[in-house]
Amino acid sequence: MLLYKNFSMHIIILFIAIITFTQNTYGEIGKETGLEIPRYVSLKSNDANIRVGPSRNYPIEIKYLKKNYPLKVLEEHQEWRKVEDFKKNIGWIHKSLISGTRTGIIISNDNKTLKLLNTLDGNVVGEIGKDNIVYLEKCKIDWCFVSLGIFKGWIDKNFIWGVKQNEIIKISFFQRFEDLYWKSINTLNEFQKGF
């Protein structure tokens, strides 16, 4: 009887996971590209201007000098994208200056260690300080596998600006269900400990 209850509970958790991941999790759709808004992009060059409005006739508000700098697209207007950086600066950039390459910026107040595994007790492979720009190789629900030069490792999403909290990047379809399953089991176990 106990085995049947455990099996039933696992089936229910799996069913909830399937429903959760098959629902539309997107925000708006951009009228120019058909892509999700908001979404993250990065700069293509070491010299890019953010303008007050969507035209070269508008004054330059900010000048970025760092290739791969992450930006969040908030709106689309013809060839222009309204973007925001991690410091909450907002302006317009021409679409030719941005790329779909996913990068993030470390927002920790101190050095945050990269993890070889996506657990807190994983092997430390290096340390990375705030304001470093990293490539987002892949992301699970709570962790991203990032690279910076020769260093690669897992880091908690809470320390990265440039990825949505529940966003999955380059992870197989079934990995999502496995992660959600184990997260649900852990939550259920914690809940049962309270009784």
Give residue spans per PLM region.
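Bacterial N-terminal signal peptides
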Residues: 10-20
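Bacterial N-terminal signal peptides that target proteins for export
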Residues: 1-12
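SH3-family beta-barrel domains
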Residues: 26-52, 63-67, 74-77, 84-87, ...
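Conserved beta-alpha structural segments and adjacent helices that either
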Residues: 23
